[in-house]
Amino acid sequence: MGKTRGMGAGRKLKRLRINQRWADKQYKKSHLGNEWKKPFAGSSHAKGIVLEKIGIEAKQPNSAIRKCARVQLIKNGKKIAAFVPNDGCLNYIEENDEVLIAGFGRKGHAVGDIPGVRFKVVKVSGVSLLALFKEKKEKPRS
């Protein structure tokens, strides 16, 4: 059972091609419109307000408490958990601080041994978290 051949087969071939496109992951992702239902709603970064600092236990076989922050996004009010990278960087973040959040690198999936965390903190109060960590800049007084 191959594909349809012949002079009048164009419509059928076109229809089959359109139907088979939905088997392609990238096509489905770009055409279903689910990107707008996600917390970032199609953008790469988002600003949010820190609600609380939390520790999330690492998955087996690792044993650690990964430092994260519960953040409410300004654009749509959704609450997400965001990982705070580097040793001691959680000390630079206070509750009610404005933070910039980015994706965590696996296209919407959790990374490594941190369950359910798909985002990371990039900036705190408009200052890069890396600059604060390396003591190149100070957090502005509010």
UniProtKB/Swiss-Prot annotation:
One of its GO terms (cellular component) is cytosolic ribosome. CDD domains: Ribosomal_S23 (cd03367). InterPro entries: NA-bd_OB-fold, Ribosomal_uS12, Ribosomal_uS12_euk/arc. GO terms for biological process: translation. The keyword Ribonucleoprotein applies. One of its GO terms (molecular function) is structural constituent of ribosome. It comes from the Eukaryota. The modification Hydroxyproline is found at P61. Keywords: Hydroxylation, Ribonucleoprotein, Ribosomal protein. Belongs to the universal ribosomal protein uS12 family. NCBIfam families: uS12_E_A. This is Small ribosomal subunit protein uS12y.
